[in-house]
């Protein structure tokens, strides 16, 4: 990108597309893009130095502003559908993270997948932390982190957890 007075507005030399699998989180995508950038940067520098680069103006009508994500935006609303909740978990990993509050403690869900259980939004459906969502589907937590503790796989976490089947995790 050529430098322009405004941030991220200059013409670009090359753009690349990548395939994103559904289960990738923000950290995975960042790593994938870093590897692509490392692979392509020398070719792009050569094009510029050899005066072969073709710079194209960006389409500013499709540009969007991305404000900083606040920590509280990571709070999970169990009334949402399972796919949106999984998107929040993946999109906010590793930081600020998607979380819920149970008995006054914050729990960050690090990895989850869509499950088949049904129940009231926020209801714990199994002993392995399957949580009901607002669309009669659920999410199965795979990895979780209790506030101030190390990340844990769900089986290990549930051994000492106060969260049990039938508990309700509210949106409050």
Q: Each predicted region: which residue ranges?
A:
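Charged/polar, solvent-exposed surface patches and flexible loops
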Residues: 31, 43, 67, 87, ...
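Donor/substrate-binding cores of folate-linked one-carbon enzymes
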Residues: 1-65, 72
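Acyl-group handling in specialized metabolite and lipid biosynthesis
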Residues: 67-80
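An anion-binding loop in the catalytic cleft
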Residues: 79-172
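Short acidic/glycine-rich loop or secondary-structure boundary segments that cap or lie
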Residues: 9, 64-68, 96, 108-110
């Amino acid at each position: 990108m050529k430098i322009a007075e405004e941030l991220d507005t200059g013409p670009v030399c090359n753009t690349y597309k990548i395939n994103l699998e559904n289960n990738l989180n923000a950290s995975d995508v960042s790593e994938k893009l870093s590897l692509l950038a490392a692979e392509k940067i020398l070719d792009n520098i050569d094009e510029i130095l050899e005066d072969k680069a073709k710079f194209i103006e960006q389409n500013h009508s499709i540009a969007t502003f991305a404000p900083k994500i606040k920590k509280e935006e990571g709070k999970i609303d169990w009334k949402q559908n399972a796919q949106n909740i999984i998107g929040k978990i993946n999109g906010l990993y590793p930081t600020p993270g998607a979380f819920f509050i149970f008995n006054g403690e914050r729990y960050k869900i690090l990895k989850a997948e869509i499950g088949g259980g049904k129940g009231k939004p926020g209801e714990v459906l199994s002993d392995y932390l399957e949580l009901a969502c607002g669309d009669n589907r659920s999410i199965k937590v795979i990895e979780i982190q209790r506030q101030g503790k190390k990340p844990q796989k769900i089986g290990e976490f549930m051994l000492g957890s106060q969260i049990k089947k039938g508990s309700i995790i509210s949106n409050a």
